[in-house]
Amino acid sequence: MTALENIKKEFITNLLINQNKGVENIQKNLYSYEDYENLLQSAYEVIKNNPDDDITSIRKKMYETSGINEAVNHLIYEMEMAPSLSISYGTKNYQEVINAGKVNQINTSENSIYDLASISKLFTSISILKLASENIIDLSKDITYYDERFHNLKGVTLLSLLTFNTPLITKGRIDEKDISYEESKNRLYNIMVNENFLSTANPYTDLGAMVLKEVISKVTNQNFYDFVKENIIDKANMQKTSIFVNPQDLSYLAPTDNTIVYKNGEFIFRNIPLGTVNDEKAQILGQQANDFAGHAGLFSTSENMAKFAISLMKYDILSEKYLKSMSKNATGRFIEELNSYKQFFGQLCYSKNPNPKATEVYHPLSGTSFAMGGYTGNQFTLDPENNVFAFLGSNRTNNRVANISGFDKSKIKHFPSGKETILIGNKEYINSSTYSSKRDEALRCTLKLSLSYLFLEYYVNTLENEIDLTGTYSRHI
């Protein structure tokens, strides 16, 4: 057995161990030794067949065999699922960005700005966990212990909201048309436990994060965005991450305007001015109040989100104990009557779902990996055990049909390229409602490549070669 083969065996053994860290039995052993061997086969062949190549050349050849170009081309140029896309990915040492499409007639780049939508929840989760790690709050205590304004939530703990374990409901929508800021806030403070919520239903909600945001502000006596900026954004040097986009940067902002949704038997066109967040609750309780709403409302770039990932992996923002607790399954289980799994959530994030078609967290990653998606077309995955990550930014809601719940799907026009359109009036619009499943191939290719780069780093370090493994690379296709 060659040195390379021995190193590959050691590396795969580590991956096998790491996939079972921090997970329940139902989430264990989702990948076998053979699965990992197949996953790394291309990377192994590149290293084996190019012994005299430098690190840059080997990484380039790994990229060329990764399938990323084909997956991104199919998603953006053939299916036209979004006007633009920017994916940052890699290891703690080395990061790449792949860009496709255009933002405001300019080629997408690592500086293109995206509406993070629900990925913003990760900043709320990390904020509450930071306070817990400093013994400022106790996650087992009731919401009302820290904030009596939520008088209907007696008996509801911080942890239960952090883990989507308490269904909530408000008297009237927080984002009702023409609602005032004061009334929207009042409805939030009068939030109640939804006693009629089905135990088999998906427990995902924005409301828990919105309540936790208020608790953090109350406990710290600080505007929530200011807290997040001080404790996360500035620490990670994320200079392009904010609740507002600077006027001079608007040309870099990927628009989400003309978001089309099917509701009550008709298509509704949502006008969203450039610089306004897509989420209406985040508009009212976030931007209009010069604050971060907690569930959505942040803008960022793929380059900034790479900085976010690296800072997390270095434990600059949150301790190892609390970071690796985020992925712990709190909701997932098999439901006999539905013959399927209830969605697996951790702490305002996804945990591994054993069903490979339903999981938001890529199965080859460690058990401490977590992920979160965003309505506007984004996804963030972090593996703090193996130290790899990926952020996918896009604007799939721009001039596209984003939601067709209740629509007659037989009226969708299908093209050989995979593109889908819907006729509204006299004009055909691209259907991007299935974007989250269609983008998975591109996302998983980047995570697979990140693991390949990690294998390369492990190989170099094991041989004790004095090679600089750090660096960045960006490309547009």
Segments and roles (model prediction):
Residues 84-86, 142, 242:
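Residues at or immediately flanking beta-strands
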Residues 155-364:
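Short, surface-exposed loop or secondary-structure junction motifs
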Residues 57, 113-114, 150, 201, ...:
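Generic anion/oxyanion-binding catalytic loop in active/binding sites
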Residues 72-73, 77, 87-101, 132, ...:
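Mature, folded catalytic cores of secreted/periplasmic enzymes
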Residues 30, 50, 103-206, 222:
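Active-site-proximal loop and beta-strand segments within enzyme catalytic domains
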Residues 1, 188-201, 212-216, 416-419, ...:
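Short, contiguous, well-ordered secondary-structure segments
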Residues 72, 87, 121-124, 128, ...:
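Residue-level preference for non-acidic, small/hydrophobic
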Residues 4-99, 229, 270-477:
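Catalytic loop of the DD-peptidase/beta-lactamase superfamily, centered on the K-T-G motif
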